[in-house]
């Protein structure tokens, strides 16, 4: 018998699914008392090298309101060649191609190990991938040079049939015509005036070609006139490389004390409009590179006077940020237009000050695009992160999917409340849609324009079975995830994942339900919900809501005597959950103090799309200790772990930090590592560096690398993350010298837990 931990792990590896509960309460009333909803983290394109795509199309249920895909949970009558849908119980005839099936000769989609399966749609044309570069030229020469080199590098990684386009912007916006031999030709637009797709179509002479023509198969080899701005790489590789090399800084003079006039809002609007007119519903990626905030035209986020700083959280709270609402509205409209046509928007922002990510965040968030934030385009952090966008799989294909749609089907006793992640609603009302919305709800279909192997959505469900309608013994609830997308090879693919979980009566089998709790998944699902609320609610209100949910969970599943906090016990399945909540409350996802609005938007963007493992690291960073007393070991994220004779490696997802304890730092300063007799010290110093390099080489986006020591200014990154179990207030009461006192008034995990226990056992609660 496998344990729940093994069961959870197997399901994640096979199906890319993690549920908060792995046995479901069988009535609506009992489900609401569980505090944490029945919900799942789902990674649609979870990498499965052992799962080759199948070269035929899925068999669908014939009932028009169902259309579920044949799967291992369906009952099959091999003699009559019939199958019964496990969602609506409709009996269906197998298509003629299945005439040879039997108990001994089953198609792959009926085998239990293929609960996830990928089909290749052989109908329809194969479309090329489209990459449209949108480049800010109001940046320093050194930065611009580095950016040009990165873009030239990316051209060499694109498939030869991919179409590319180039738009540059400063005070004006230039759309470059790429088909001209020996001459640079571009259309110039004013950066202060927005254009509709129709106006753009007429101005660029795109209106002569019907939209349908641009999406038919033969047109790919013979690009229509509308492709003057989007040309195959193999045809214009040299020209575009030269054109990029010749790009100059924006020529408009910038007076003293002023910011350059930058028309980011209009540039992005033209990019969205260009793709809308020429290639709707085809996999396309707008890659926008910005080196500062928009200072004119629609979408501007700050004026051009340098003495007026860009908005802070304080300004926003005091309603003193005059451009935020208007700027956000402009970019939201663009994000929705791009999402409708299935196009992805990436934003690569590199500057020392804010660039307006707060206002622009909806563009990558709604289209499944990337958001990358750095100090300069001339850093390895940007260069390597950008290179990783073009990572390829073992078959030499990009690890990116385009124009995805996710449809979810459920059994009758459960409905879908909504999804939180990089998606937009397709407003598809079906029988399995709940009236209680969580996140993007009121639909059973979502559009995910850009997908990577780690893109993960949080899906929330509602048990609707009534209390007085018992589910038969041994009954199971089922959910089917159907993801259709354009593979980077140009093929349309459909990945189908079908899972089932047992029902249990919460009044008689509460132990079974409690034992099935996945505390890691639950923590991330509740965190996504809290961050989603934080976008529209006051920070303290969100923290209070989170605390209330935690107290209720402790009251429901803890073991205790009324009014006796010392008697409180949590079973192993719940024991880490309060600790996750403690670190979540202190995290930059919910605490905006000390972070700019752009930084908060950046952190939240990544949390809302990453898989479970990476999300857990973001909430509760991992700490490893290196010392002479043994091999490297994971240690508690606690101030007591900071010792003089230790090196610590902390991974927060966004940063990799190496911290040298006081003694180690002194030895390093004295140069002992360079003396042959202290070779073991040299190895000790090198070990965390090697481990850090491994993480730096594989993660997207590449983390910031920090090397610091006791008393170093950057040690603050470590001190702000660890649990302050020893502070300047209690350090002398411990009667020992271990650990480092943290100068903070924040409560420690111990104090937090004591308060939690007191509130959970209180009879007044």
Curated annotation (Swiss-Prot):
The modification N-acetylthreonine is found at residue 2. Its main location: membrane. The gene is Sec23a. The lineage of its organism: Eukaryota, Metazoa, Chordata, Craniata, Vertebrata. It is a peripheral membrane protein. The Gelsolin-like repeat mediates interaction with proteins containing PPP motifs that include MIA2, MIA3 but also SEC31A. These interactions are probably competitive. It comes from Mus musculus. Keywords: Acetylation, Cytoplasm, Cytoplasmic vesicle, Endoplasmic reticulum, ER-Golgi transport, Membrane, Metal-binding, Phosphoprotein, Protein transport, Transport, Zinc. High levels in brain and fibroblasts. GO terms for cellular component: COPII vesicle coat; COPII-coated ER to Golgi transport vesicle; cytosol; endoplasmic reticulum exit site; endoplasmic reticulum membrane; Golgi membrane; perinuclear region of cytoplasm. Zn(2+) binds at residues 61, 66, 85, 88. The keyword Transport applies. Gelsolin-like repeats lie at residues 632-718. This is Protein transport protein Sec23A. It is found in: Cytoplasmic vesicle, COPII-coated vesicle membrane; Endoplasmic reticulum membrane; Cytoplasm, Cytosol.
